[in-house]
């Protein structure tokens, strides 16, 4: 599959010399431009800038750099604005370890010190933690799950925001919460379950236990 130089992608797993479960492919090219570059594409989520490029019967999701608008339902932005800036796109990511990108021309793009947090073993929200969790409350569960999978700690301000906003998990479906709980329980560090108690999360999701 030929990848344009505009496209950048990276996962924390590759930085830890692990085999990534998936790659996020993102680009400054607009969805229409991506579709024009490849003969076989599927309009997966044009509204949010995502096109699936088919190559040898395998689908690759390619998403245009974007800035998210206000989140009204605690999960989806009301609208998105496409941007030519990779940094603006990375600003909307949940945690610093997920806010890195790489391409052959620029190398590693790490505006939020995700590599440093990987080395320190820290889960830290990008920017203002309360804003990140207000956008999607499931990120509160994801913080604990990532900490359990990697054996990391959660940065102080990030954990404090989790505690303050734990009640917002009532907006999240039981199915989505269960997925995160299962991943936590089968992780290498299931003892991190204690974080759910320490942050008050268990009081909100007791029905899932």
Show which residues each predicted segment covers.
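Catalytic cores of the polymerase beta-like nucleotidyltransferase superfamily
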Residues: 1-209
